[in-house]
Amino acid sequence: QNFNKVYPYALVGRKMMAQVDSTIAADVSKRSQRNRYINDVEKELFRIFEKDIRGMTVNQGLLLMKLVDRECGMSAYSIIKTYESGFAANFWQLVARLFSQDLKSRYDPKGKDAKTEELCRIWDSGEWDSFYWSIFMTSPPRTIIKTETLSSEVKKR
């Protein structure tokens, strides 16, 4: 159930990260422009996803971090460090450690995350609905994501 709710967000996260990286590479040459653009992106992401993310359970949030790592190839710590700063990454790592979590932990498809990797394989192969039905005898609930790209206002900067 957690996977079904969270994986679509990780897939959208991958698309948005690629969009941000592409915009930075093509249109942002100065550090101040980059910082302004990243700040605008952050505001847009909060506007789009804050309600949904805050509505997730702790386990769903942890799974989302793992799946974002799988899709983007970066731990939550590395993403924060890359797009914000080392200071921000260290701050959030400290907060995570207070709750016995680690933003630096990586997705391990052959080890502790092998079961999650199998679920990703089933989803990506297009067999998710029948797999879900075989377990729960009902169709999987759909996660509705408002948008999969950043708005044009963010892209223009």
Segment roles from a protein language model:
Residues 39, 46-48, 63, 152-157:
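Flexible, glycine-rich surface segments
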